Amino acid sequence: MKNQFLEITDPIHDFIRLNSTEQKIIDTSVFQRLRRIKQLSGAHLTYPGAQHTRFEHSLGVMHIAGMAGTSLASKKQMPVTDIDDIRLAALLHDIGHGPFSHLFEEVLQKKKHITHEQIGKEIILKSEIGDIISKTTDKKKINRLAVGEGKKQFENEIISGALSADMMDYLLRDGYFTGAEHAKIDHNRITNSFEIYKNKLALQSSALVNFETMMISRFQMFKAVYFHKTVRAGEVMLLEAMSLADDHLGLSEMNAKEYVEQTDDTILEKLTSLPETNSELKAAKKIAIDYQNRKLFKCVFEKTISGKKSFGKNTLKQFRQDIAKKSKLAESQVFIDTTTTHSMPLAPSKKESNSIILIKKEGSKITPQIIPISEIPLVSTMSGKMNILRAYTQQKNRNKVEMAAKSILGEL
């Protein structure tokens, strides 16, 4: 049967073309659920336009991954037949995300140490999505590739890492919908400049400036959007409410079938409808209702911790206890947030990317060069971690907690 194509209009990529297998996958209820999971959790309370979801982001990642595959295939560096597999894996790279994306994952990790990648693998193998994939290719191969465990390293790097389709789409898309002007990325130039060297993804040296611009854009987006103090206030509230209500709602005990029925709205509805049978549930319900009505926690202390220093859970717990004691408040009224990310994207191995392979072409002569990211002038200034320590509380406790937090955290 002739493959039927469908074109979807997209504000980032103009048109995204889907083949029949891709169409069948996005039409499943499991995939359609991503329409109801916001890409940026609670950022819409600060940036009203940030209503975009994991659904359209997944389509965008598939599109850019296809561009990367087409570029490499045109240079005879990979078979044309592998492009569809890369696109499928990219389409499904976020299929395991739960409500409120990474926030729900934090709740799962506290008790079960489960990641959205692990859940995604189970969904691909055991749901109708796996059955659809099996009609055209190996679902186990797609499953591995979607979570960065494919046999060909360069294919993993197309989906996640310093040159990934995932990062290019989320920066472009998040910048567009938040209205932030930091996401300046020429993804066409970058993907057209892809090469393969020793089974790893490389970049033509002439596109180094585009890589630098992308890394700077990423750094700025973290500072201006992802780690914005008010964005984080909403996320701290969601995380606290879900953590307090976990035992009652069984959020971390859900099986795969229950998990894929959950969305941002279903979880928020459960939180705002909690019975007030104990202090934890009462607090969780109040926080959720305040979040829903945008009565957000107030940031009373903020400090950027430079370099590679970070704080463990026990240290953060001690900070919370000390500030509460000094403020003469219950510990439940003080919230410590530390936003930490590597300044460079993580490779598929989950380790920080520390080098990039540049390919210099002069006629028929090809010269590869492995450049430590620390030696790229514009990028090296951002090496280490972005680590921001903040203290939050309710409006009524603002002055007390501010004084205590400055006293305890000010000299760090």
Task: Specify the residue positions occupied by each region the protein language model found.
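Short alpha-helical catalytic segment bearing the HExxH-like zincin motif
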Residues: 86-91
